Amino acid sequence: MTENVPQGQITMPLQQGGAREISPQALAVADYLRSHKLLKQRPGILNGKRSDFFRVKRAIRALEDPKYKQLQSKPNSKLPPINSRNEAISIFRLMPINQMALRVDKLPTQTALMMKQKPEQGVPVLQVNPQQEFGDDMYYTWFYNPVPLTTYLYGALGVAAIFAGVLFPLWPIFLRQGVWYLSVGMLGLIGVFFGIALVRLVIFVLTWPTVKPGIWIFPNLFADVGFVDSFIPLWAWHGTPERDLLPQKFKNKKKKKNAGTVIESKEPPRKLTKEEKQKQKEANAQMEQMQAAFQTQLSSFATQMQQIKEMSDSGIDPQIIAAQLQAQYPPDKQAAIKLENEQAQAKLDERIRELAAQIQDKTNANKTGDKIEEVADKENKEAPKRIVTLEDANDE
């Protein structure tokens, strides 16, 4: 099976419809990938239910694994042959075509909460993407969930337990006593669980009006987690902040990332002196003058461009138009424009240095760097709008 599929992203719209017959090759590939260790599947929440998802590049690695060739070489194997990456991508396309695995997107926690989803710690909320693409870092989730062998074993054990319960009158006395003690112990555990739930509700009701938004003890008590994780953390405020839903490793990364940042002060802004207000007015006036000059030059260029367009539409030779443009910008005028731009840039740099010196004198050292960068960035962003270079004029 050879198909020239380019590497990277391949778009395929999601097909809507009812149940369809699954090809034997797709079923064999799904059985091979479903439990492969190279897939590194993780749990996610799709439509309120747990669903394993994985990256496309890991599925391609699993299909290129030598173990696949060994299984495919067996006489009764239904696995299609794979000899290149393009063929591996073509084989993986059988998953969305047969709707056994579809592309999904991981939703940000805030978006999931707005959609009334309930993300859990380390378990992101997933959403099916209508465009089924095959980029290396894209995610796919399984819609093919074969019944494992353990399910049949549990079913057989359930039938055996029911049969043994029917024969309870025939049990020996020591077995009957053991079952009675076990039943009492289980009822006691259930009672303790309901007692904890009642106590945490009472504590929340008492703390909600006094210490808003209220406190829950064992906030994960009813979450879909393990027994030990149900009691961790010990308490939490009502509501689930976005940071609390992140795994611990992401919290540590955030701490390291924000370790060197300076916390902004909550002090009220300092009032400007008369001298500073006067300098600010002068600076604003200079800015307005430069903007007016820029608008004048822009209008002039627009007029010239309109004239050039009219000349071009009338059939004038382009060489004549170029000669006229050259006449409008003789060498002495070009030198004057260049000198004017250099002077404007020098004034701009001088103004930035003055503002930096004022901030250095009037503020503490922790805030100086941020404010200088803010002023410099603002001035530099405005500079291209005020200075029209000769190259831009010639390009137009």
Swiss-Prot record:
Q: Which InterPro entries match?
A: Sec62, Sec62_asco
Task: Return the Basic and acidic residues bias intervals.
Answer: 264-282, 368-389
Residues on Lumenal side: 176-178
Q: Which GO terms describe its biological process?
A: post-translational protein targeting to membrane, translocation
List where the protein spans the membrane. 155-175, 179-199
Say where the protein is mainly found. endoplasmic reticulum
Give the span(s) annotated as Disordered.
252-288, 360-396
Out of the domains of life, which is the source?
Answer: Eukaryota
Report the function annotation for this chain.
Required for preprotein translocation.
- Record text on subunit structure and interactions: Part of a complex that contains SEC61, SEC62, SEC63, SEC66 and SEC72.
**Family label:** Belongs to the SEC62 family.
Q: What is the protein's name according to its record?
A: Translocation protein SEC62
Provenance organism: Yarrowia lipolytica (strain CLIB 122 / E 150)
Q: What is the lineage of its organism?
A: Eukaryota, Fungi, Dikarya, Ascomycota, Saccharomycotina
